[in-house]
């Protein structure tokens, strides 16, 4: 029995431990699943935002590359013209230009050349012999008018949802509805407190009353429940002895019963008869009586 009790205790401990670990595991899953879901949602939102910013940056770089391809650089002729004017002198009094030549025949329109690369900075001009010339100030470049607006760009990615706005003002009260039908009567109310006792009335005047005629007898009432048992009566006189019955049949043989208890000691026996002198006494203590017997 002790071994079985120990086994039952061990199995009970193992069962309780398994149930406890299962409950802890279920609670852990219930707690960690929402956290993991929120983290995955946050990472997904961050990646989407970073991808949108990267896409916007890529589109901006591509637009800049397109603008650089379409830009026209100034040719080398204008730069050389400015350099030649600087080399010839800074003022008209020192360096006078020659007379204009005859106009040449109009040439054929040339093919549009490719935009050349920007040239190197020109060599500074030589100073005049007397050194009294002031440097010629280069006229500023005329501002070019703004070009036509470019084609509309691609729509950007949808932005993050904005914050919730402030709650609006409460609306106006509606028109009161029509009067409803009469409802069923309500339950009875709580009984009120008992009123104050009234004033003592006046005693009635006693008048002699004459007895009326006897009425007819009423119907018999229903049978009542049985009454409680009465008290025990006195002990009766013993009855007469009955006649002896017939003898019964012999019983079946059975095993002997256990020996009964020892009976009470019997009455004392009669006094013994007077003794007789023996004829011979043996050495071994044997006694022989007159009748030849040994007692």
UniProtKB/Swiss-Prot annotation:
Q: Which GO terms describe its cellular component?
A: collagen trimer
Entry keyword set: Collagen, Cuticle, Repeat
List the residue ranges of the region (Triple-helical region): 98-127, 147-203, 212-277
Residue ranges, compositional bias (Pro residues) = 97-109, 146-160, 217-228, 261-271
GO terms of molecular function? structural constituent of cuticle
Stretches the record annotates as Disordered = 81-278
Q: Which Pfam families match?
A: Col_cuticle_N (PF01484), Collagen (PF01391)
Q: Does the keyword Transmembrane apply?
A: no
Composition bias type Low complexity, residue spans: 172-182, 229-244
What InterPro entries does the record point to?
Col_cuticle_N, Collagen
Q: What does this protein do?
A: Nematode cuticles are composed largely of collagen-like proteins. The cuticle functions both as an exoskeleton and as a barrier to protect the worm from its environment.
Tell me what else is known. Answer: This protein shows 4 potential triple-helical regions, which contain glycine as every third amino acid.
- The family this protein is said to belong to: Belongs to the cuticular collagen family.
Kindly provide the name given to this protein in its UniProt entry. Cuticle collagen 3A3
The taxonomy runs: Eukaryota, Metazoa, Ecdysozoa, Nematoda, Chromadorea
């Amino acid at each position: 029995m002790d071994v079985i009790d120990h086994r039952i205790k061990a199995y009970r401990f193992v069962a309780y431990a398994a149930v406890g670990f299962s409950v802890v595991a279920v609670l852990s899953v219930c707690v960690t699943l929402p956290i993991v879901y929120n983290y995955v949602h946050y990472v997904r939102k961050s990646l989407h935002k970073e991808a949108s910013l990267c896409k916007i940056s890529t589109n901006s770089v591509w637009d800049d590359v397109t603008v650089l391809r379409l830009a026209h650089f100034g040719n080398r002729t204008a730069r050389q013209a400015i350099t030649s004017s600087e080399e010839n002198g800074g003022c008209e009094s020192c360096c006078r230009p020659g007379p204009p030549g005859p106009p040449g025949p109009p040439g054929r329109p040339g093919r549009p050349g490719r935009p050349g690369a920007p040239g190197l900075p020109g060599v500074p001009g030589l100073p005049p012999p007397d050194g009294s010339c002031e440097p010629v100030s280069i006229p500023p470049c005329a501002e070019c008018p703004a070009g036509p607006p470019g084609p509309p760009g691609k729509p950007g990615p949808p932005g993050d949802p904005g914050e919730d706005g402030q709650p609006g003002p409460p609306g106006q009260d509606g028109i009161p509805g029509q009067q409803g039908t009469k409802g069923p009567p309500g339950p009875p109310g709580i009984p009120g407190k008992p009123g104050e006792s009234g004033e003592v009335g006046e005693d009635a005047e006693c008048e002699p009353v004459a007895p009326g005629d006897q009425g007819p007898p009423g119907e018999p009432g229903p049978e009542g429940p049985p009454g409680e048992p009465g008290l025990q009566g006195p002990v009766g006189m013993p009855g007469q002895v009955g006649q002896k019955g017939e003898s019964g049949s012999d019983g079946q043989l059975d095993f002997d019963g256990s020996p009964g208890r020892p009976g009470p000691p019997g009455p004392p026996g009669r006094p013994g008869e007077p003794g007789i002198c023996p004829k011979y006494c043996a050495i071994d203590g044997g006694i022989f009586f007159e009748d030849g017997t040994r007692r």
